[in-house]
């Protein structure tokens, strides 16, 4: 049985790897996700002199934020990274020094693009199909356009979270038409009606629900950009394209960590520009403080 260490012990463990890193990066998730984070962050900062060879997963979001708030060790630059989650839609979080909140549902959202999906399919397929054939089979934009109803679903997840204090994030397989690996919009619509009915049964008025929905629709248009931002990349978008690859290119069984690791190797990094700035800024601020002292 694997020993589970406390957040404090995980933080202290970073000391033993300081020589390998210019900055200490703390994240959510588990040890199994290290390769994914390191690959992504190394690509992100490769044109700088910053070294990132390790990251330090601390567990859930609350643990990461708590660790950041209580971290008074200023010997080295550090950055704590947390997901935007469902709160991205309706809550303005207080700023915390050395804490970076992603502006999408989770870190996995950033590795989804046509290049990463199709390159992964090409490699896993062993090159049997040309890249042009892969792109035609996958039809990346078509898959996303057919999945825009997930934006509405996540609007209602967030309304449920804001008003009721919790929501049930069912896996995307619950919304699949498994015959052709696409989102079944009727199933999505039925689930939205269930959420509405549940809220009304808890005495939330239709007027309040409509007002809450309008606020979200005004903030996030119904577009692919919004889909890639507010719908969970980990539980929805990556599994969506895993199923598409399995149905349209080649059938292969991989753990979820392997899929996102493959995507992280070739994904477009433009949407991670602000995170790159935050990493560079954390290093510069530390250097400036050291110079002043």
Where are these regions (language model features)?
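Acidic, divalent-metal-binding catalytic cores of TOPRIM
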Residues: 1-293
């Amino acid at each position: 049985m694997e020993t589970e260490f406390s957040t404090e012990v995980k933080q202290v463990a970073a000391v033993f790897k300081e020589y390998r890193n210019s900055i200490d990066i703390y994240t959510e998730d588990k040890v199994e996700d290290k390769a994914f984070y390191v690959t992504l962050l190394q690509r992100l900062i490769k044109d700088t002199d910053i070294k990132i060879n390790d990251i330090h997963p601390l567990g859930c979001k609350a643990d990461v934020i708590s660790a950041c708030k209580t971290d008074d060790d200023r010997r080295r630059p550090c950055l704590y990274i947390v997901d935007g989650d469902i709160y991205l839609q309706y809550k303005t979080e207080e700023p915390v020094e050395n804490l970076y909140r992603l502006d999408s549902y989770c870190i996995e959202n950033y590795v989804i693009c046509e290049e990463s999906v199709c390159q992964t399919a090409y490699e896993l397929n062993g090159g049997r199909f040309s890249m042009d054939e892969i792109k035609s089979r996958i039809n990346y934009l078509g898959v996303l356009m057919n999945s825009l109803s997930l934006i509405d679903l996540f609007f209602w997840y967030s309304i449920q979270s804001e008003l009721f204090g919790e929501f049930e994030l069912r896996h995307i397989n619950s919304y699949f038409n498994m015959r052709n690996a696409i989102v079944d919009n009727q199933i999505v619509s039925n689930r939205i009606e269930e959420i509405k009915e549940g809220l009304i049964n808890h005495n939330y008025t239709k007027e309040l629900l409509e007002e809450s929905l309008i606020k979200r629709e005004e903030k996030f248009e119904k577009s692919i950009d919004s889909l890639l931002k507010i719908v969970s990349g980990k539980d929805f978008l990556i599994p969506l394209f895993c199923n598409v690859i399995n149905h349209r290119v080649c059938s292969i069984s991989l753990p979820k960590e392997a899929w996102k690791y493959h995507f992280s190797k070739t994904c477009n990094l433009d949407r991670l520009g602000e995170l790159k700035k935050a990493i560079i800024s954390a290093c510069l601020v530390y250097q400036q403080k050291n110079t002043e002292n």
